Amino acid sequence: MAWDDVSRWQPVDLAASFKMGDAVQPVDVRDIGYRESDAQVKNALRIDPMEFESQIAGLPEGKELIFYCDRPGEATSLKIAMWAFDNGRSRVGVLVGGWNAWQDAGYPVEPKAG
């Protein structure tokens, strides 16, 4: 797995892809930030970053999985995206700037599930 196997999505590009109906699926992999937040990216699925290996299989096939976190340098997102790629998911990406960039830009959020 190389860094260039993981696409980098700017928040503006992910927001535009939603409007165009592109086959993308945001995946929230925040840890403490998730517990402390009451919101997530609109239509995001959630996997626990401490248990991601067992939860990746439950994510939809046929869509590019866009992982986001709130760690500097997308550290958690990149780790999980690289693992997913190495384990058969050919379309993976990370949201540049993660949750904070998405929220700061004012893009759609929703109450987190559960």
Task: Set out the residue ranges of the language-model regions.
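Flexible, polar/low-complexity N-terminal or interdomain linker segments that lie immediately upstream
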Residues: 1-37, 111-114
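A generic "binding-loop/recognition-motif" signal
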Residues: 31, 52, 98
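Glycine-rich nucleotide phosphate-binding loop and flanking beta-alpha elements
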Residues: 33, 53, 73
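Short, hinge-like loop/turn segments at secondary-structure boundaries
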Residues: 43-45, 109-113
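Alpha-helical scaffolding within the catalytic cores
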Residues: 49-56
